[in-house]
Regions:
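Residue-level signal for functionally critical sites in structured catalytic/ligand-binding pockets
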Residues: 10-14, 18, 22, 32, ...
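Aromatic-residue detector
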Residues: 4-8, 22-28, 34, 43, ...
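A broad, low-amplitude sensor of folded, mature protein cores
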Residues: 4, 9-10, 16, 49, ...
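Short, solvent-exposed recognition patches
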Residues: 40-135
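A short, solvent-exposed beta-edge/loop patch
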Residues: 26, 30, 118-182
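Charge-rich, low-complexity N-terminal segments
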Residues: 1-66
Length: 182
């Protein structure tokens, strides 16, 4: 045993033992070859946004085929209601719907679009949306500013996918007030 603990033989033996251990570990470790994108249920945030917001909340009437809703965030701070809803698109890009009654609306829009430079406009179901593009982030944005709030559809998704998301947006009804116990 002495010759396996000294010199080059010891080094080679230790290396062989380590490689055998790594090989055994790789054989018994489960490996998934399928992509897993976590899915979130945004229905509660959709209802709560419609309840809390002073403006008409827009939400997808139906999630597009092969799209996965993967994030939702509803914040209410100092009377400002902001809802963000993120998706992994069918082409595995990112798209997000963001809306808020933050004032001035331009600050919210510029922050969500990561640019303050309009690049054109497009008609989507009779409504005019402003286009913005930030090349260094590969971020496209569609913007609509209403008198009481702003809506931004943005992400790395291409214009067609962002337009498809904008087409699904529908006003959400205000839910009935929650009865208080008392």
């Amino acid at each position: 045993m002495g010759r396996f603990t000294q010199g080059i033989y010891g080094y080679a033996f230790a290396l062989l033992v380590c490689l055998a251990a790594v090989g055994a570990f790789l054989l018994v470790t489960p490996q998934s070859r399928t992509e897993h994108i976590p899915r979130v249920d945004f229905s509660i945030d959709r209802v709560n946004a419609a309840r809390a917001a002073s403006y008409e909340v827009l939400a997808p009437g139906q999630v597009l085929p092969d799209w996965v809703p993967n994030s939702t965030s509803l914040t209410e701070k100092n009377g400002v209601v902001t809802w963000r809803l993120g998706f992994a698109t069918a082409k595995r890009q990112h798209a997000m719907l963001a809306q808020s009654d933050e004032k001035p609306s331009a600050d919210f829009v510029n922050r969500m679009a990561n640019t303050d430079k309009p690049g054109g406009s497009r008609q989507i179901d009779g409504a005019t949306w402003e286009e913005r593009f930030r090349q260094d982030k590969n971020q496209r944005s569609l913007v609509r500013v209403f008198p009481d709030h702003a809506v931004v559809v943005t992400g790395t998704a291409d214009w067609d996918e962002l337009t498809a998301l904008a087409r699904t947006l529908a006003p959400q009804p205000k839910p009935s007030p929650v009865p208080s116990s008392g």
